[in-house]
Structure formats: C-alpha cells, structure tokens
C-alpha cells in the first residue's frame, strides 16, 4: 500500500524521504567520497571516468556533470551531500542555493536576510507564488516525478 504523501504538494520543494533516500543512495555516496582530497583530485582530473566508478544512474551522472543541483535532487540527491560538489568546485553554499533559484549569490543572500520567500501563493502547487514551477529556472521540470 502506497503511503499518502501530502507534502508532495509543496511547490519548489523536494522532500528527502525514505523513497528519495533509496533512489539517491549512490549519488549521495559519490558525494561523500569527495570528503577525501585524493578523491576530489581524481574527480576533477576526469569527472566522467570518476562517476563511471559509481553505480549511479546515467541521469544522476549527467545531472552531476551539468552541476544542476535541482536535477540532482530530483534523482535522489540530498542537498547536504550535494554541497560537497559545490565545495569541490570552490563554491559557497549561498552560491549553490542561488543557482537553484535562478538568483545571484547577492540576490539569494538578500532574500534570506529579508526573511526568505513569502508563503503567499506558495502553499500548494498551482498557486502563483515565486516558488511555483512557472517562476523557477527549472520550470515545470522542477515538479516532483512519480
């Protein structure tokens, strides 16, 4: 019996639940490997070859190579693990988060310092707030997949 997941109706949000955890196990393990300097060096020297050493899906590998964190998350990546990719690339977490929203680092920081996104129009998918897919750089691709 499938679980009722009312949280899937939150726009602009991928909930890292047990299903996402299973789906993203190998992409997250790859990210954890970047904790070691020698693995970061191997990855940067030949990214496709390093990724081929992991039993990730081809979609996960493409998402990593594209540095598309929204795509990585849709394939099961957890943002706290994915942050290691950004760190390997010399990016701050603010830069990474900004890239996920289509904002510059400064725009993202200013939005967060000002209290974050308004909940108005962002409580459920289908409203017209700023977190809705039609207002995001990933567009309708940002919707949760079945």
Which residues make up each language-model segment?
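Charged, low-complexity intrinsically disordered segments
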Residues: 1-146
């Amino acid at each position: 019996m499938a679980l009722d997941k009312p949280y899937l109706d939150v726009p602009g949000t991928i909930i890292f639940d047990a299903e996402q955890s299973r789906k993203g196990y190998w992409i997250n393990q790859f990210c954890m490997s970047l904790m070691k300097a020698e693995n970061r060096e191997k990855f940067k020297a030949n990214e496709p070859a390093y990724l081929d050493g992991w039993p990730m899906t081809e979609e996960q590998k493409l998402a990593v190579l594209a540095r598309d964190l929204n795509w990585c998350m849709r394939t099961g990546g957890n943002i706290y693990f994915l942050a290691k990719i950004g760190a390997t690339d010399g990016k701050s977490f603010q830069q990474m988060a900004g890239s996920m929203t289509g904002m510059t680092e400064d725009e993202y920081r200013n939005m967060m310092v000002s209290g974050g996104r308004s909940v108005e129009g962002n409580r459920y998918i289908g409203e017209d707030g700023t977190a809705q897919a039609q207002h995001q750089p990933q567009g309708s691709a940002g919707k949760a997949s079945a």
